[in-house]
Amino acid sequence: RTAPGSTFKPVTAIAGLSEGVITDNDYIYCGGRFDKLPGAPLNCWLLSGHGALSIRDGIANSCNVFFSETAYRLGQNEEGTFNDNTAMQKLIQYANLMGLDKKSGLEISEASPQVSNELPIPSAIGQGTHSYTTSQLARYATVLASSGNVYNLSLLDKSTDSDGNLIEDYTPEMIDHADLSQSIWDDVHAGMEGVITKSNWGIFQDLNVTLAGKTGTAQQSKNRANHSLFIGYAPADNPQIAWAIRIANGYASTNSELVAKDILNYYFGLKDETEILTGQASSASNSNAGTD
């Protein structure tokens, strides 16, 4: 298990929209740092700042200040006073709604997830005490892709006898549903499509299938490279596949995106297998900069 990094930001977006602390018409200004609470400010990965961002732009640009401000508003009372516990409980509520408080249902041993229970501002951008397996993030990606359907995952499709007769069909079991307004899902989906078309188009521009995604980097130790993460689904308008990729100590999220590109080329038959499995390593980024 590791922290999810910025792949968690859609949860914060959903919480903010559902609780009414942000709307489609709101813009939050990013000047490069969030400094409304005592102590060291929380920096955006873009130190010069993103400027004014809508909810969709906040997701597409993975702006730390946008989601820190959203969490801050979640914790404010009617007088504007901020309460850590109030903000934290709302983030927990919507993380649980996305199924992040449950094991994924796989038929093998799996670590229990940890939804962050302290430090709401860092938690809103995927830090805090969050800790999830890759399979739990894959289930979360499926919830986003399906507009709220929480399924138990399975390693099996079906079992047959030696003659090909069906013994058991492992149809996905829907265990919950996140009942949100369609406008909220539209904002999240558009933001995740923007991650691809606005922020990472150079990687996917020659891929003949549309996709939506969310990148992430998670720091576990200052002495080791960040973990590289990328969740998503495709095609963007009618998902057939959802995924979560984590490369332990894999530096930038770009490296996970390159893995996803190979998977999609193979899954949709866009490239011959011999073009994908070359026996040679791809060029990878060894930058440890947090740009998502």
Question: Where are the model-predicted features located?
Answer:
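Intrinsically disordered, low-complexity acidic/polar segments
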Residues: Q240, A252-T254, L270
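Short, gly/Ser/Thr-rich active-site loops of penicillin-recognizing serine hydrolases
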Residues: L166-E168, E173, V259-D292
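Beta-lactam-recognizing serine transpeptidase/beta-lactamase-like catalytic domain environment
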Residues: R1-S6, V11-A248, A289-D292
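Short, charged, low-complexity patches
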Residues: L137, A252-K261
